[in-house]
């Protein structure tokens, strides 16, 4: 049948298109191609440091030149075509704003490779004109940004490979040609969910798809469209939710590599279907939130696996499986960072024929390594650290694995003589030995290096090794890291070790080493980065050779007996980040050249004998510290809060391989009753050019004025200049220290007033100007009124909150500290007080003797009663040595309770039995007590109390007991008995908001929106009262829904105010989360400064408000994975999905939906990442007031705002 004319025309057109596509393009002049390449060079290459494009010159190669085919990096097709077919400029260090127009105009260009340069800019201009012959494009490892335009490479119909990895691309997308086989967009900043979904929907022919290390969020799409994929990598993104059921079961048959590590995937995978994994060789599901009571048995179908990684899920538990024995191809098995328990199965040793790496670290495994592991003849890396293994398996089993290169057994319970000799004899290839944090003793073998010539790392910290450091360690020519800290070593540091040519880390702190530090540092190379030999007994001076070590990052010589001055030349150490010379006997001047160290963020010179003035040049590096991680080493910071008892603001330790409980025994900790320990893995990360963050020059003999230039250090968090002889005024420029958390200027001779600008320092949580000659009012703004009076003591000219009001004459005339008249009056007053006290003491002695005689007969009866107290509850009692405990009175603040005793509390709680226990938290256990008169109270028994700080406890209780407000839970009384501390509170019928919202089974009432609104405003009112109306002002420090209690009328009562500060003074080793609050409520800035502020309370209140709006918990792995409520809400708002935030039970009334959005807006303002942009609690109340103006209800009932206080009766508060 003849075709119709239109069809014939169309067929002819298609034929013509095919012919044109297949026919060679008409040749273009060589000069035109050269001009295009030169145009690219002019537009894109601003810097060519190595002259890589020097050959790009017309006429190069002589008269018969084939330019540009003879140019470096340019390849042409063979004759007769002869056109440019490839441009490869990879790794040439070229820099400039990339413009691809000219290159994409080359019609025969098939391969473009610009990998590993410094090109920047975006690709919005990159739109090749058809026909496009490109087959491979690689622009990876540059600095591109912006979004991918839809037109990017769109006309390239034969494109097979695109690599844009390791840039800064943020989103966008481009249509895939059906010919595409490989796409690598890894290590960018891609967050576009559309691009993610499009990548999975358009990957029909793609075999290699790598989207790892981006910012993709949401759920993982199905793989159904990716029928040809062999490698899929979406690791290290922000994806969440459960895994798609068919991810493996219906995966393409060719899939060999699947990596979803480092996301927030959750859910139980114990029954997950692995039916489609027959050809998988690599499976990595590590570092998610997956759970199972065993390793998923479905994995038995994946018998071709060569790599299986399930580390870091933390919820995988149970015994290690034995079915892995059948995995004959397995070469790497990593199950670290989970909750696996029990012994290591003997059967696992049977799969060792080919296994190269085995990582079972950070679980809860017990016992020893089975003898069957001696068969692991290919094993090179064995990591069993962070378990509870014991026994002599190192000598009997590990030492027989001759192929071993890395052995990591730290943080176990291995005891006995250190096994280095048998390891050296049996494992000659060892490069890494890590036996830290065990209980090994004995000496370090002297001939280690002759047996282990390849040894790179010797890590033996936190053991009980003794003897001396053998000089023969200097024969380990490849040794890079030595860590012998926290042992019992004595003697000198051998010069041979100092001379090691490749040494990077030399860490030997907390031993008994002595002598002088050899002055041969970096004499055989400049590789040394870490020199931490603090807290030994070194004498002599700081070696001058230290200034040759130009790669030094961390230097800690503190806690020794070094003398002399700091040698010149430190200013040359441009990589130096941490310098600790504190607690020595150093003298001379503080080196001004330290301000030339552009990376210096931590300078601690406290407790020496430095004299002279503070050099203004120290601030010279402000704004010069480059962005990025300054130090990636593990650290511990011991924050000192003991004032004059322990000098300095705190101590930073290198903390690799040390148990926290061992550190707690360290003299710097247990001699300081108010020291806190914080740990981390990085010291600081700057997003912009930064400055020093820690500067401690306290306890020296510095004189002169404080340089105003220190105010330029905008990232400074700790500044301690206390206990010197400084004079002059506090610089006004200190108001620019926007990151400051601790500022100590105490015990100097400063005069003048406190600059009002210091009130604007939102992070300031520790401020001490006591013992100076300051005058004038304490600024009423910001944090300054929240500090106790002791921080302003002995400045007789200061006034205002928390001191007496200005205009109030002090008892001895208000003369400045040191005034002769003032001293005479003080002496006279002291004599009178002394006489009166003597008389009083005599009277008390007579009364006490009489009482002792009367009570002696009943003591045994009373003691027997105490010993018979029930012990069925969780409470424990420390009453040894307490006389007459039952008759101890409860100090009360309410008249009806004035005759309450400890015996009454025992009776009302049945000896604090489990039946009366109604709750427990970070500060203690709470019991319900019904007194004889029928009244009901709640009794909190404090935990973490060490018996120290009696005066602080009493003073704090007396302060808290006087605070009365209808939205605060009143403290009715307190009792001290032995080492125990009891607090008596008013009982709240409906319990905590946390239970009512999140535990439906225990909740006594259901909260509708009107009730939640009432609670939101009531708790805000209580918090605002603490911040603005109490004297001194109080920071809550642990605001959360479990500290919002509900009374009979469902009125909110904020509880535990003042408790965090009290426990801060009593407990010596609280965790970071206890100090700062509760996870999920902690403001982001706390992890920079470890300081609590009123704006931190505002953030925590914002979380409570989100709980009321959403009904969700702040942290819930089943809802948010590794994210939290705040992060989830911010993501919902960003994606215009705010309606999904609200509790479904609140959205029934459409008329009230607009109000929910208004309350959500207030919550988001409270949760701003920048503290200075959060409202105060007074401003929050004002916003609530504004919302109520058009409302029929009046749940704010009379609330009014004055200049600085809250008043609920219409009269200005004190």
Swiss-Prot record:
It catalyses: L-seryl-[protein] + ATP = O-phospho-L-seryl-[protein] + ADP + H(+); L-threonyl-[protein] + ATP = O-phospho-L-threonyl-[protein] + ADP + H(+). A motif (Cys pair 1) lies at residues 69-76. It is a single-pass type I membrane protein. Glycans are attached at residues 64, 122, 145, 163, 197, 210, 254, 264, 279, 413, 466, 524, 537, 689, 727, 773. GO terms for biological process: brassinosteroid mediated signaling pathway; hormone-mediated signaling pathway. It is found in: Cell membrane. Its main location: membrane. The active site is at residue 1038. One of its GO terms (molecular function) is protein serine kinase activity. It comes from the Eukaryota. Keywords: ATP-binding, Brassinosteroid signaling pathway, Cell membrane, Glycoprotein, Kinase, Leucine-rich repeat, Membrane, Nucleotide-binding, Receptor, Repeat, Serine/threonine-protein kinase, Signal, Transferase, Transmembrane, Transmembrane helix. Residues 1-29 form the signal peptide. It is an enzyme of class 2 (transferase). Highly expressed in roots. Expressed at low levels in shoots. Brassinolide binds at residue 678. InterPro entries: BRI1_island_dom, Kinase-like_dom_sf, Leu-rich_rpt, Leu-rich_rpt_typical-subtyp, LRR_dom_sf, LRR_N_plant-typ, Prot_kinase_dom, Protein_kinase_ATP_BS. Its EC number is 2.7.11.1. Pfam families: Island, LRR_1, LRR_6, LRR_8, LRRNT_2, Pkinase. LRR repeats lie at residues 106-130, 132-155, 157-177, 178-202, 204-226, 227-250, 252-276, 277-302, 304-327, 328-353, 355-375, 377-400, 401-425, 427-451, 452-476, 478-500, 525-549, 551-572, 573-597, 599-621, 650-673, 689-712, 713-736, 737-761, 763-786. May be involved in brassenosteroid (BR) perception in roots. Belongs to the protein kinase superfamily. Ser/Thr protein kinase family. This is Brassinosteroid LRR receptor kinase BRL1. The lineage of its organism: Eukaryota, Viridiplantae, Streptophyta, Embryophyta, Tracheophyta.
């Amino acid at each position: 049948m003849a075709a119709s004319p239109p069809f014939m025309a169309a067929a002819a057109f298609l034929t013509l298109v095919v012919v044109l596509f297949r026919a060679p393009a008409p040749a273009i002049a060589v000069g035109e191609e050269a001009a295009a390449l030169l145009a690219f060079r002019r537009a894109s290459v601003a810097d060519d440091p190595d002259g890589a494009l020097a050959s790009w010159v017309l006429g190069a190669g002589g008269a018969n030149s084939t330019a540009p085919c003879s140019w470096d990096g340019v390849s042409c097709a063979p004759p007769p075509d002869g056109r440019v077919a490839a441009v490869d400029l990879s790794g040439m260090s070229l820099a400039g704003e990339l413009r691809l127009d000219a290159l994409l105009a080359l019609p025969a260009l098939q391969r473009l490779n610009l990998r590993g340069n410094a090109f920047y800019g975006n690709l919005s201009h990159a739109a090749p004109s058809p026909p496009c012959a490109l087959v491979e494009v690689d622009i990876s490892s540059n600095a591109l940004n912006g979004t991918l335009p839809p037109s990017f490479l769109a006309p390239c119909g034969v494109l097979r490979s695109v690599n844009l990895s390791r840039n800064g691309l943020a989103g966008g997308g481009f249509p895939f040609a059906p010919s595409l086989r490989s796409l690598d967009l890894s290590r960018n900043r891609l967050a576009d969910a559309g691009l993610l979904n499009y990548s999975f929907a358009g990957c029909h022919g793609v075999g290699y798809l790598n989207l790892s290390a981006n910012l993709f969020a949401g759920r993982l799409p199905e793989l159904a469209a990716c029928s040809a994929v062999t490698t899929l990598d979406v690791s290290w993104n922000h994806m969440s939710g459960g895994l798609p059921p068919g991810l493996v079961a219906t995966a393409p048959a060719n899939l060999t590599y699947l990596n979803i590590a480092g996301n927030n995937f959750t859910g139980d995978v114990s029954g997950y279907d692995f039916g489609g994994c027959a050809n998988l060789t690599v499976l990595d599901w590590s570092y998610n939130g997956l759970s199972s009571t065993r390793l998923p048995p479905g994995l038995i179908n994946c018998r071709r696996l060569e790599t299986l990684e399930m580390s870091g899920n933390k919820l995988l538990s149970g015994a290690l499986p034995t079915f892995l024995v059948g995995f004959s191809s397995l070469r790497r098995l990593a199950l670290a960072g989970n909750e696996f328990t029990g012994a290591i199965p003997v059967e696992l040793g049977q799969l060792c024929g080919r296994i190269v790496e085995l990582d079972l670290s950070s679980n809860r495994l017990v016992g020893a390594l089975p003898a069957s592991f001696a068969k692991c003849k290919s094993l090179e890396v064995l990591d069993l650290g962070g378990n509870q293994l014991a026994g002599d398996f190192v000598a009997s089993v590990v030492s027989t694995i001759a192929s071993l290169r890395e052995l990591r057994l730290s943080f176990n319970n291995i005891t006995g003589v250190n096994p280095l000799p048998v390891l050296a004899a049996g494992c000659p290839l060892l490069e890494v030995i890590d036996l830290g944090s065990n209980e090994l003793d004995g000496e370090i073998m002297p001939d280690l290096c002759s047996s282990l010539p390849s040894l790179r790392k010797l890590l033996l910290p936190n053991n009980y090794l003794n003897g001396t450091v053998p000089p023969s360690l200097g024969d380990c020519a490849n040794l890079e890291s030595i860590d012998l800290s926290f042992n019992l070593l004595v003697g000198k540091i051998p010069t041979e070790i100092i001379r090691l040519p490749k040494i990077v880390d030399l860490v030997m702190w907390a031993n008994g080493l002595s002598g002088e530090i050899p002055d041969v540092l970096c004499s055989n190379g400049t590789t040394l980065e870490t020199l931490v030999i603090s807290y030994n007994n070194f004498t002599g001076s700081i070696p001058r050779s230290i200034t040759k070590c130009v790669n030094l990052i961390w230097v800690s010589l503190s806690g020794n007996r070094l003398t002399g001055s700091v040698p010149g030349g430190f200013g040359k150490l441009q990589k130096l980040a941490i310098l600790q010379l504190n607690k020595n006997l150093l003298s001379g001047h503080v080196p001004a050249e330290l301000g030339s160290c552009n990376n210096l963020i931590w300078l601690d010179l406290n407790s020496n004998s430095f004299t002279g003035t503070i050099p203004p040049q120290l601030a010279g590096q402000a704004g010069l510290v480059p962005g990025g991680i300054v130090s990636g080493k593990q650290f511990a910071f011991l924050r000192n809060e003991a004032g004059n008892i322990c000098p300095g603001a705190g101590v930073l330790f290198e903390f690799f391989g040390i148990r926290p409980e061992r550190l707690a025994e360290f003299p710097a900790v247990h001699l300081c009753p108010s020291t806190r320990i914080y740990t981390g893995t990085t010291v600081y990360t700057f997003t912009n050019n930064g400055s020093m963050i820690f500067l401690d020059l306290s306890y020296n003999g510095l004189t002169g004025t404080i340089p105003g230039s220190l105010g330029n250090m905008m990232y400074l968090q700790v500044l301690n200049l206390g206990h010197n002889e400084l004079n002059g005024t506090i610089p006004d420029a200190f108001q620019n220290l926007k990151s400051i958390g601790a500022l100590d200027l105490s015990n100097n001779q400063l005069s003048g007033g406190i600059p009002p600008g210091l009130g604007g320092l939102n992070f300031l949580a520790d401020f001490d100007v006591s013992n100076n000659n300051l005058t004038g009012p304490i600024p009423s703004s910001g944090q300054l009124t929240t500090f106790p009076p002791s921080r302003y003591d002995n400045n007789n000219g200061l006034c205002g909150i928390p001191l007496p009001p200005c205009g109030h004459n002090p008892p001895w005339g208000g003369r400045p500290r040191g005034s002769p008249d003032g001293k005479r009056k003080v002496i006279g007053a002291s004599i009178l007080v002394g006489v009166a006290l003597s008389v009083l003491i005599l009277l008390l002695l007579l009364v006490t003797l009489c009482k002792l005689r009367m009570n002696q007969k009943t003591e045994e009866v009373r003691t027997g009663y105490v010993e018979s107290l029930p012990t069925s509850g969780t409470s424990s009692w420390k009453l040894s040595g307490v006389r007459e405990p039952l008759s101890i009175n409860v100090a009360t603040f309410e008249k009806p309770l004035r005759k309450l005793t400890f015996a009454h509390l025992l009776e009302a709680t049945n000896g604090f039995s489990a039946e009366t226990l109604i709750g427990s938290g970070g500060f203690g256990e709470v019991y319900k007590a019904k007194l004889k008169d029928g009244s009901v109270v709640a009794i909190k028994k404090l935990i973490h109390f060490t018996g120290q700080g009696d005066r602080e406890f009493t003073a704090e209780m007396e302060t808290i007991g006087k605070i009365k407000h209808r939205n605060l839970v009143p403290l009715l009384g307190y009792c001290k008995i032995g080492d125990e501390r009891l607090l008596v509170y008013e009982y709240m019928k409906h319990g905590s908001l946390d239970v009512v919202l999140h535990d439906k089974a225990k909740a006594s009432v259901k909260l509708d929106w009107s009730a939640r609104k009432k609670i939101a405003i009531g708790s805000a009112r209580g918090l605002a009262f603490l911040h603005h109306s109490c004297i001194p002002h109080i920071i809550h420090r642990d605001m959360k829904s479990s500290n919002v209690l509900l009374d009979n009328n469902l009125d909110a009562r904020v509880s535990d105010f003042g408790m965090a500060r009290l426990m801060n003074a009593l407990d010596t080793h609280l965790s970071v989360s206890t100090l700062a609050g509760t996870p999920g409520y902690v403001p982001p800035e706390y992890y920079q400064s470890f300081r609590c502020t009123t704006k931190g309370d505002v953030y925590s209140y914002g979380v409570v408000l989100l709980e009321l709006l959403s009904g969700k918990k702040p942290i819930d792995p089943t809802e948010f994975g590794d994210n939290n409520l705040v992060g989830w809400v911010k993501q919902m708002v960003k994606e215009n999905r705010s309606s999904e935030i609200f509790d479904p039970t609140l959205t029934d009334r459409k008329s009230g939906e607009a109000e929910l959005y208004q309350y959500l807006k207030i919550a988001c303002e409270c949760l701003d990442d920048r503290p200075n942009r959060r409202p105060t609690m007074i401003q929050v109340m004002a916003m609530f007031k504004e919302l109520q103006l058009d409302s029929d209800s009046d749940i704010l009932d009379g609330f009014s705002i004055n200049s600085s206080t809250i008043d609920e009766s219409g009269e200005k508060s004190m």
